[in-house]
Amino acid sequence: MTDKPSKTQTSFLRRLLVAYLIDTGKNTVPLIIEATGMPRRTAQDTIKALHEIEIKVEQFNRGEYRISDWGAVNRNWIKNNFTHVCSVLSYPYKME
């Protein structure tokens, strides 16, 4: 039996994914959109919401972001579960 993921789960996983993408060089809204296909507003709102899960993101240069602190989040979990996260979110992204 496969259950549809809850909005809470997808919101949390989307935040983890966006933080991971920023940390691995997909650090602008256009690059995140290109990688995932998510709408621009979703990408922007997700970046703005990262602080809610204690991930600190900084904007530098023009429109570029970087993660300055992962807080309690284990970055390696996202790396190791990348395919699962993309699958739950229905994002086609593949690591290069």
Sequence positions of predicted segments:
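Short capping segments at the starts of secondary-structure elements
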Residues: 23-28
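Long, low-complexity, charge-rich intrinsically disordered regions
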Residues: 1-3, 7, 68-96
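Alpha-helical residues within the helix-turn-helix
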Residues: 31-35, 51-52
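Short, Lys/Arg-rich nucleic-acid/phosphate-binding segment
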Residues: 59-66, 70
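A short, conserved structural fragment
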Residues: 51-60
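Short, leucine-enriched amphipathic alpha-helices that occur as contiguous helical runs
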Residues: 11-18
